[in-house]
Design a protein with these regions (language model features):
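Preference for long, amphipathic alpha-helical scaffolds in soluble/luminal domains
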Residues: 1-233
Length: 233
């Protein structure tokens, strides 16, 4: 692990391990220096994380802090969006998982937004959202829900809504629907013959990459090849 540091004009490690943010120091020692560190739960007691938890609502969500436009807020699930964002911060920055009761509450809130089809819906009103569905799934997997049947259901939905080329796109975009119009419409089915979106496919693949079984699936490999084909165009 040390050889790569010799290739750099400036060694970043001293700055990282002397950072005031204890989480940065922790993961630098653990993931970069391969040092033995204290249990991850030590990060859960940091004041930064506790401050975030103080804003959690009774239903497990976090309230969106902005004002927004009222006619859009009535159609978009802003609290789901904010809870997704906050969960990402807690999981990725502080290593929290479902051993913590407040993470379980947040997960329960997000799972309450999962439909019978398997997608997580509401951020685009009634419309399908492979990107947000997969992004939420990625965080839930990292939080310890990889073996949960609701995650399996989500993957089955993602596989069912692929474009014919093997990638993903936002369904209402494939029929050229305007965003504001889509928010007020019934579910818009995708035109699967349209080409995949490299942006959406990249987000969806993050959920596959986080899952022990699905990361090696032929569908993930195919989508990865498609995504790689868009590099340096």
């Amino acid at each position: 692990m040390e050889n790569w540091r010799k290739e750099l004009s400036v060694d970043p490690i001293p700055s990282l391990i002397s950072a005031k943010n204890k989480a940065i120091e922790y993961f630098t020692r653990k993931d970069i220096l391969d040092e033995k560190v204290e249990p991850i739960e030590t990060l859960w007691e940091l004041p930064e994380g506790k401050k975030i938890f103080n804003r959690q609502q009774e239903d497990g969500s976090w309230k969106y802090p902005g004002g927004g436009k009222e006619h859009l807020r009535s159609q978009e699930d802003y609290n789901q969006l904010e809870t997704f964002r906050i969960l990402g911060e807690l999981v990725e920055k502080y290593g929290l998982n479902n051993r913590h009761p407040k993470i379980r509450r947040a997960a329960d809130f997000l799972f309450s937004r999962q439909t019978d089809e398997g997608d997580f819906r509401g951020i685009y009103s009634n419309q399908y959202s492979p990107n947000y569905s997969a992004a939420i799934m990625e965080l839930l997997i990292k939080a310890g829900y990889d073996g949960n049947p609701r995650i399996e259901k989500g993957f089955k939905w993602l596989l069912s809504i692929r474009q014919n080329d093997g990638g993903w796109a936002i369904p209402f975009r494939t029929v050229n629907a305007k965003y504001a119009d889509a928010l007020k419409a019934e579910i818009i089915k995708p035109d699967l013959a349209k080409p995949f979106s490299h942006l959406v496919t990249g987000v969806v693949l993050r959920a596959f990459a986080a899952h022990q079984k699905y990361k090696n699936s032929k569908e993930a490999i195919k989508a990865g090849e498609l995504l790689a084909s868009r590099f340096f165009l």
